[in-house]
Every structure is written in structure tokens, then in C-alpha cells.
Amino acid sequence: MRQYYKIKDKYPDALLLFRVGDFYETFHDDAVKASSILGIILTKRGAGSNSETKLAGFPHHSLNTYLHKLVKAGERVAICEQLEDPKKTKSIVKRGVTELITPGVALNDGILEQKSNNFLASVFNIKNQYGVSFLDISTGELLIAEGNLEYVKNLLSNYDAKEILVCKKNKSAFTNEFGNYSSIFYFDDWVFNKDFALEKIKNHFDVSTLKGFGINESNVGLLACGSILHYLDETQHKKLEHIIKINQIIDSSHVWMDQFTVANLELIYSNSKEGKSLIDIIDYTSSPMGARMLKRWLIHPLLDLKKLNFRHSSVDEIIKNKDLLFSLQSELRSLSDLERIIAKVVTFKISPRELVQLKESLTKVKSIKDLLSDKSLINLYKINSSLDCCESIIKLLEQTLSNEAPVNIKKGNVIKENFNSELDELRSLSISGKDYLNKILEREKNNTGITSLKISFNNVFGYFIEVRNIHKDKVPEDWIRKQTLVNAERYITSELKDYEAKILGAEEKISVLESKLFEDLITELVKDVEVIQNNSFWLANLDCLVGFANLALKAKYTKPILNNSKDLEITKGRHPVIESQLPQDSPYIPNDLKLCDKTNQILMITGPNMSGKSAILRQTALIVLLAQIGSFVPAEKAKIGIIDKIFTRVGASDNISAGESTFMVEMNESASIINNISKNSLVLLDEIGRGTSTYDGISIAWAIAEFLHDHPYKPKTLFATHYHELNMMADSFERINNVNVSVKETKNSVIFLRKLVPGGSAHSFGIHVAQMAGMPKGLILSAKKMLKKLEKSHNVGNDISRDNESEMQLSFFNLDNPKLEELKEDLISLNIDELTPIEALIKLNEIKRILKS
């Protein structure tokens, strides 16, 4: 165990899989963890003694089965292998850790998800400037970014990092600012030192400056990047030639969405177990590379009109040529995951079978180029020009590799015949030797008259002759008996031993030579990493565009018109997710919507509960997003002035773990919107103020609507509310207009028409919804009586004066006592123009306190 303890001391934070013969063993606390996670038996060696040791293990060939379970459970797993043949040493077998696999650093297919990246992240900050870096070692993508806390938090959430590197001194600050993550590894301060980080990065890329990557060396993201490269060293990942560049995430190139928006719009994940996210509906990609790229496009919609026009026009070209669509889909579907295969090539973790798949996939590139060779396909021809047929790589693989190459190189027949003369000679010797064994068998059968005689092999005796007991009296005297079984005897002969030496010697030499030739092949392929990665990039792009075309045809989407105006006009728009879930005989009811900065800046949307207000908000955002990732959209027509930020405050939720109520979460999200508005923002607000009392809620909703209306950037806003009193704002604010989701009211029921029409609604029909939910009749009658009483005595709408704005600001209160008169004077004296949103909320809280006292 001394060897084990010595190795374990080097990896105290990892679960150590210690190779012992044909098993991986775990000991002590590692054994307890492994037993619990994997469901394997926990045993004890030396039970009851001072040297009692807990252990649990599994066969070495089951590594891939168990490894992903350990990593998914958040464990860092150190794999300790035998570094020499036990047969060739008389002392303890030399062992060492050959790989440290962590949740964020993995190349194993069992751990990785085909359609998702597996990002390792690192975060570091200098005062208020935060840097972040992301690496997916399985694809070679290395990214950096810098910005304020909120920006980096959004990136960390959107990129779904599986593991995060953090400076030890920032441990508590990181948790306070970013929350809890399941897998975090802490480094000492010196790992984030600027000189150390820059040296690490420059050494990896073999450059003296980072200007070639367009990155300023003062970028805080580089410090995070340096720690990632250091972590790869620490985890025994030395071969990294597939990481050929750093890409900078530039905020100004993409639509800004905070983490609330990505979650509220359910872009990647649904908020319910049975629900569907947007990506579930729009993903018509045919390859893993395309699926991963589509996810990236969705969290980073474009602002560049030129790039968007290229995508839309490419989709249009494919739609107009359906034969091309079906042919491209067929070719793309047959591609292997080139990004991850080339990563395995570089790290020498590739199997012979996967190299055959690489050859077949590269062969498909020629077919795809041919399909895109028509120069009338102006946009798609650009992709044709960007693809490389890789003829020299295909030729090398064709000459070297057997078409029937196995998964495991140890099974042999990896290298093609006639590629290496020495290998051909050894194979001939091995085959002829086996033929000779068959001749020996036939000869001895004839000589002895034992027709059931057979020649077999095992690792103990090598080749032997087996004779059943009923024939053992016929055995020649020169045969040497080696083993007695219940029903048979086993013998060897000098002739058998001579040929055994030749055959086994040849087979061992074949194994060694094939391994060397296979490594030589991989070494050659490493030189072509960049060209294969470039093909992978463009094939993934093409896959997304073909997927968009397929989506547009199947779901009847149309090409949007994008421009740099301030207008947003959607004709007969539909919600892509809801529409896809409806039965065929229940078509989605489309809606028209128009926003602009001159007359229709804010639409105040009222209507009954369950009428579809929230769906209209989300559908508008999703149509904009689809347009700005290059997809067609679910609408008859869509004219969209480029949106640079999308904000949502949709749905009720709390954050109990952080001690935040539903209302506090609502205010946090609203504050994020107010503090980050830009020139071309789209703001979606749903039921602002419902987390508190009616008067507080109306006051806050009113104040936020007014703030957005008067903001110099005039953000386009959809404001869904159940406070019908807010309809009064349209009379005093020139760019606020009322619309409602209409209903048809009958004697005993309400029919939801789901149609957006001009004008405000005065009823929520909440009692009707309760009735639909199956509430008892007596309860419903009681509720109706109470509603009538409340409407008579607490008609807030009647309190709101429409005469002038100053009265409107005070009409929430019935000012008929001295305390309220004093409060009135205090409010009138306020300079509204100088109040920040936060100060307004503080003042509101103070008013609430006075009214309660």
C-alpha cells in the first residue's frame, strides 16, 4: 500500500482509481464514495485489525461504464495505470496517474453530451473588472471575456460551465456574487498572476504577442485563461495542439440578455419537467457539431445586419431548392463528430474505428462541396469555397488503415495489407504457423487414431494437445503430460513448443509494430488539425442553416425583414413553442403587434387571467430572437429594427436559498432592466407588482411604466398587467397605448378568444377561471358576492383623476386626514426628474411606513 499512499498524497482532492491487474481498486474514503455512487460492493481487508482497509473495485474493461457516473456526481477522478508489464518485472509494478478527469475536463464519450459543450470556466476579478475564460477540451474552443459582475454572471450561466476555477482568496466573495456551483476548484493567488498567465498563454501558442488574436494584454480574461492552461497541466493534459486560437466574446456584437431573460424565455431549458424549450422546437440539425453551434447562436443572437442577411439569404436559397435540402441533410446526417474526433487525435486517445469514421466523414466533404458548387447559390457558394476536401489526409488514411479496423488496437488488423513489408512478413509467419498447427493436428489424429484430439491454447501452458480419458492409452510415449482434468489429459510436444515460440513471437512483434505505425499515423494527422477544425466549423454552420430551412418548411415560417429602424411590426405572429404543442385540429391564433418610438412605444396589455397575455410577450421576444440568429420566423410578416438588448420580467418565482421573496426577485429583475436600458432595447414586463399589496403594486407598476416612457432611449415595451387602473396612463402619456386580449362573455362562462385588440379591459375574470378549475359552487357564489362588495367600496379606478398628471400621481390615496395632507405636501415638493429609480423605490417604502403608522 506504500505505493498507493505515495500517489494518493499527490492527488488528495481526487478519487483515485488504482490499477491492480485486471481491476481498478479504490481504498479508504474513496472506496466508500465509489461504492455509494456506483452501487458496487464495499469490502474490507484485514477486518478488525489495525491495518483494516476498506476497498471497492470493478473490472478494467468497465471503466467507461463507471467513469461517467463518478464525474456526473461531481468527482475529480485520477486514473492510475500500470506503467510496465507485470510479467517483465520481479519487483512492484511501476504505476502512475496518466489522466485526471474532472467535470470540466473530459474527452470520454460516456461523460460528454453530444449536443452540448462541456465547458471548464475560470473567473477572476481586479476590483470591479471581471474576467472569465471558457474551454471545451473536447472541441478545442477557448474563449475569453471581460466586463462587470452582471455581464460575467450572465456568461457563466449561459455557457453552463461544468466546473469553475476560482482564486482561493476570492472563495467567499465568489459564492456571495455568483451563488453556489456544484464543482469548483480553488487555486492559489500566484496562478492568476499576470506575468504567469501571459507566459502560459504565449508558450502554448508559441507567440511573443497576443496582438494576432486581437486581444489587449490588459484583458482580465487572460488571467482566467492562464489558470485554465495551468489546470490542464495539473490534470495531465499535455497534448493540446487542437487549441489553436483564443476567441474573444465581444459584448457589442451580440444581443444582450441577462440570465433572467434566458431563463424566462426558456431558450435552452424549460421551466417545467414536461415542457419544451425553444431549442427543443427549432433544432433540426443533423450533426452534433451543428447542434452545439445552434445553442451558441441562440445565446448570442447577432447585431450585424450583414451576417444576418447572409444567414437569411442562405436559408432562402435552400428552401427554394428542396432537392438540395434533402441531399444536404442526408450528407450531414452521415458525418461523425469531427470536432471531438480531432481532439482525440491530438491527445492520442483516438481508436482505430474512429479514424475510419474520420476518413468517411472527410470523404463526405467532397460530396457536400459538389452540392454547393452552383455559383447561382450566391451565399451557399461561399461555404463551398471555405471547405477543404482534405485529399491528402484521406489518401493517408486510405493507404494506412484497414477499412475493418477494430475499436481496440490490441485486437489487431488495424494497419492495411501492403502498407508495411515487415508487418506483412510477420503476419504471413503468424498465419503459416497456425496453418502448420492444423497440419500437426491432422497428422497426429491419423498417427494415433484419436479423431477427437484437439490442439488448444492458454496463458499457462501455451499450446497443448487435449485427449479424452477413453483414448489416453493411445498417447505416444514422447508426449509430455502437463495437466490432468476430470475427463481428459493435456500434453505438450517439443514440436508444438518450437512453433509456439515462432507464432507468439510473431504476434507480439505484430502488436508492437501495429501500435507504432498507428502512432505514426496519428502524429501525421496532428499536423492537419487546423484544416479539419475549419471544415468542422463550416459544416456546423451549414447544418444550422439547413436546419432552419427544414424548420421553415415544416412550421410555415417566413423570412423576416431586418433593418436599423426603431420599429417592430409583426403580422399574424405565433408562439413557436406553444404552436408546436397544439393538436393539429387546434391552430394557434395569431396576433398583430406594432411598436415604435414615436407613437406606440409602450403597449399596456390587459385581459383576463389565462387569456394569453404572457404568451404574447414571450412570442414577441422569441420572434425577434429567431430573426436575429438567422432563422425564419413564425409570422405572416415581420419587420424588425435590430434589437440590441432584450429584458423580461415574466413569471412569479422566489429565491428562498438567498432569502429573497417573490417580490424581491421581481424588484431585482426590474432594477436590472431599469439600470441597463439601451438605445434599441425590447422590454417585456408581465404583472409587475403582483408580489405585494394592491396599492404598492399599482404604484410601482405605474412608476416603472412612466420611467420607461420618459427615458431618452424610449425602449419598446410590452407591459402586461392585471391592474386595469394602468389603462388611465394612455390618456396622459403620448406613447402609451392600450390593448387587450379579448374574450367573449356569455351568461355562465367566458370564452378566451386569444386575440389582441385595441383598448383596455376592465375585468380579470378570475372567478370564472376558478370555476373552470373546479372550485366548489358554494365557494364561487361566495366569491362573486365578495367581489360586488369590494367593487362598490374599493374602486381604485374611480380614485384616479384624468385631469392632469400631478393629480394622477396622488390619486392612489384618499387625502382626507392631516397625516396624508402632510404626505401630499412632501410628494409635491419632490423633484421627480432628479430621482433615480432606486431612490423612488426607497421613497415609496418610506410612504408605506408612514401610512401604516
Predicted regions span which residues?
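Short hinge/gating elements
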Residues: 45-57, 206-217, 268, 278-282, ...
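Conserved phosphate-binding elements of NTP-dependent enzyme cores
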Residues: 2-6, 13, 522, 540, ...
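Charged catalytic and DNA/RNA-contacting regions of genome-maintenance
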Residues: 1-317, 326, 330-333, 337-346, ...
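Extended, charged coiled-coil "arm/hinge" scaffolds of SMC/Rad50-like chromosome-maintenance ATPases
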Residues: 402, 485, 489-523
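Active-site phosphate-binding and catalytic loops of NTP-dependent enzymes
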Residues: 80, 103-112, 239, 376-379, ...
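Amphipathic heptad-repeat alpha-helical coiled-coil/stalk segments that mediate oligomerization
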Residues: 193-200, 256, 267-269, 360-435, ...
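Charged, surface-exposed helical/loop "interaction arms" that form contiguous linear patches used
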Residues: 347, 351, 361-364, 417-418, ...
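ATPase nucleotide-binding head domains, primarily ABC-like/P-loop NTPase cores
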Residues: 28-31, 218, 286-287, 291, ...
